[in-house]
Design a protein with these regions (language model features):
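Conserved glycine-rich cofactor-binding loop
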Residues: 18-19
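Active-site loop immediately N-terminal to the catalytic Tyr-X3-Lys motif
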Residues: 104, 152-158, 180-181
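Residue(s) in the substrate-gating loop at a strand-loop-helix junction
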Residues: 147
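Active-site helix of classical SDR
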Residues: 126, 163, 171
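Substrate-binding pocket helix/loop in short-chain dehydrogenase/reductase
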Residues: 102-103, 107-115
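Conserved glycine-rich Rossmann-like NAD(P)H-binding loop of the short-chain dehydrogenase/reductase
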Residues: 34-48
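Alpha-helical segment proximal to the catalytic Tyr-Lys
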Residues: 131, 176-180
Length: 186
């Protein structure tokens, strides 16, 4: 979607945007006319490089660094950013991890890190952002990335395959809750 057709001055947060799919999404958002908040956990140099590439396209960009697996850090960083810059037009929940291991050999840490990063992050990132987006009284967009593993499972990915359907279900439920104020989720 090209932001010029909406008439909005729009900012989009992309989680996990320092490399890979998240980087590509951030750059495409800039190409489409959005300002971008580039999120990373700890790859600050790569995230700043993405932000520079966004700025080179004539858009504004800033970097936020926090671990989406925890509750406090995302809430603090996102609340402060919204207070300083205003509510986002959109959010792309892209960040995630895999720790592939056969279930009998899977450690509790491997289970927890994947579930907290992939599933809990849905809440940790979106909860501080939804009401500011609603209060804008303008359309908004939230996109969550999941995996076919969330529908059919995958050998060696019990933790990953358990987390991904939660994202799908959470997205559908939030889509119903946020439809009336004009915020769509996919």
């Amino acid at each position: 979607m090209n932001v010029d057709s909406t008439g909005l001055d729009a900012t989009v947060l992309v989680t996990g945007a320092s490399r890979g799919i998240g980087k590509a999404i951030a750059l495409r958002a800039a190409q489409d006319g959005f300002d971008v908040v580039v999120h990373c956990r700890n790859r600050l140099n790569e995230a700043e490089s993405v932000a520079e590439q966004v700025r080179a396209q004539g858009r504004q960009a800033r970097v936020l660094a926090f671990d989406i697996a925890g509750r406090e850090a995302p809430a603090a960083a996102l609340t402060a950013d919204v207070e300083a810059h205003g509510a986002y037009y959109g959010v792309v929940c892209n960040a995630g991890i895999a720790r592939d291991t056969a279930f009998p050999a899977m450690t509790g840490e491997e289970w927890d890190s994947v579930v907290h990063t992939n599933l809990d992050a849905f809440y940790n990132v979106l909860n501080p952002l939804v009401m500011p987006m609603v209060r804008r009284r303008k359309p908004g967009r939230i996109v969550t990335l999941s995996s076919v593993s969330g529908l059919v499972g995958n050998r060696g990915q019990t933790n990953y395959s358990a987390a991904k359907p939660g994202i799908i279900g959470g997205t559908k439920a939030q889509g119903l809750e946020l439809a009336k104020p004009g915020i769509t989720l996919n």
